[in-house]
From Swiss-Prot:
Gene Ontology biological-process entries: carbohydrate metabolic process; glycerol-3-phosphate catabolic process; glycerophospholipid metabolic process
Domain of life: Eukaryota
Gene: Gpdh1
Subcellular location: Cytoplasm
SUPFAM superfamilies: 6-phosphogluconate dehydrogenase C-terminal domain-like, NAD(P)-binding Rossmann-fold domains
Record has Cytoplasm as a keyword: yes
GO CC list: cytosol
Protein's organism: Drosophila americana
Name listed for the protein in its UniProt record: Glycerol-3-phosphate dehydrogenase [NAD(+)], cytoplasmic
PANTHER family, sorted: GLYCEROL-3-PHOSPHATE DEHYDROGENASE, GLYCEROL-3-PHOSPHATE DEHYDROGENASE [NAD(+)]-RELATED
Self-association and partners: Homodimer.
Entry keyword set: Cytoplasm, NAD, Oxidoreductase
Length: 350
């Protein structure tokens, strides 16, 4: 890429806006990048004014990242194709349910030699059973390579500039450097690995475990029980990758995308928080999303459903009792208090 690299961020929620702070600053500071970074923003009206206009005038996403200034070179664009058409790097950071539709809109409208990177923690149901990784959907639809970025990265803490690490999974070494340059900052340290599938699967599965941690918090079962749920969750994550994505490295689970992300999400993430409220309030997950998340969606429950679909197809539900129980609690087939009985005789204990 001899010419300057154009960057587009597809998405402007809490995490998309937080990452825009880093990407915008790096694009402005580093000579290999075009300074102007476009950010696709789903248009909404806030107090009678368009959200894109507010962002471009005040350099703040007042809906999803209030109190944090975005770099002035990050430009909000309400039209997806317009935002993405000149991009050499497309950063996807939207709820995973939107990806197939967005890809359809972008097909044939982007540079043929562009690359993508997905920051999306979740996956889709494949036709005929199984799981479709978001990076695979993007590559299949857009005919471009897609890396992934996952880690212990709570959006508000990243926006505050607190130190953290992240993992980029990139199977093609030639893209590793430009992606690291784009995301690396003093407070946001990047490790690039080639085991992209395991990196991405970790990012999705940990949201299921975080729901379990939230149920434990809501039931006031204490730190020992929560630690057991986190450990069993990690073991099921490793086993899941082993079964469905053989050839992944165990060492990947010890990167930020694995155990670190699992810990932070089970103590600080929205999946944990809403799951705790699900136990204590008796309200539905849908109602709690509206109340607590400002219209944003949880990734844990739909991911648990997609994973359960896959496990059921292979007759493996009993080998993953934690994932199975969390799915059943999220869909009201079990009560939260039944969680511990479901994992008391975990295969790990046999």
């Amino acid at each position: 890429m001899a010419e300057k690299v154009n960057v587009c961020i597809v998405g402007s929620g809490n995490w998309g806006s937080a990452i825009a702070k880093i990407v915008g600053a790096n694009a402005a500071a580093l000579p290999e990048f075009e300074e102007r970074v476009t950010m696709f923003v789903y248009e909404e009206m806030i107090d009678g004014k368009k959200l894109t206009e507010i962002i471009n005038e005040t350099h703040e996403n007042v809906k999803y990242l209030k109190g944090h200034k975005l770099p002035t070179n990050v430009v909000a664009v309400p039209d997806l194709v317009e935002a993405a058409k000149n991009a050499d790097i497309l950063i996807f950071v939207v709820p995973h349910q939107f990806i197939p539709n967005f890809c359809k809109q972008l097909l044939g409208k982007i540079k043929p030699n562009a690359i993508a990177i997905s920051l999306i923690k979740g996956f889709d149901k494949a036709e005929g059973g199984g799981i479709d990784l978001i990076s695979h959907i993007i590559t299949r639809h857009l005919k471009i390579p897609c890396a992934v970025l996952m880690g212990a990265n709570l959006a508000n803490e990243v926006a505050e500039g607190n130190f953290c690490e992240t993992t980029i999974g990139c199977t093609d070494k030639k893209y590793g450097k430009v992606l690291r340059d784009l995301f690396q900052a003093n407070h946001f340290r990047v490790v690039v690995v080639e085991d992209a599938e395991a990196v991405e699967v970790c990012g999705a599965l940990k949201n299921i475990v975080a729901c379990g941690a939230g149920f434990v918090d809501g039931l006031k079962l204490g730190d020992n029980t929560k630690a057991a749920v986190i450990r069993l969750g990690l073991m099921e994550m490793i086993r899941f990758v082993d079964v469905f994505y053989p050839g992944s490295k165990l060492s990947t689970f010890f990167e930020s995308c694995g155990v670190a992300d699992l810990i932070t999400t089970c103590y600080g993430g929205r999946n944990r928080r809403v799951s705790e409220a699900f136990v204590t309030s008796g309200k539905t997950i849908e109602d709690l999303e509206k109340e607590m998340l400002n219209g944003q969606k949880l990734q844990g429950p739909p991911t648990a459903e997609e994973v359960n679909y896959m496990l059921k197809n292979k007759g493996l539900e009993d080998k993953f009792p934690l994932f199975t129980a969390i799915h059943k609690i999220c869909t009201n087939q079990l009560k939260p208090k039944d969680l511990i009985d479901c994992i008391r005789n975990h295969p790990e204990h046999m």
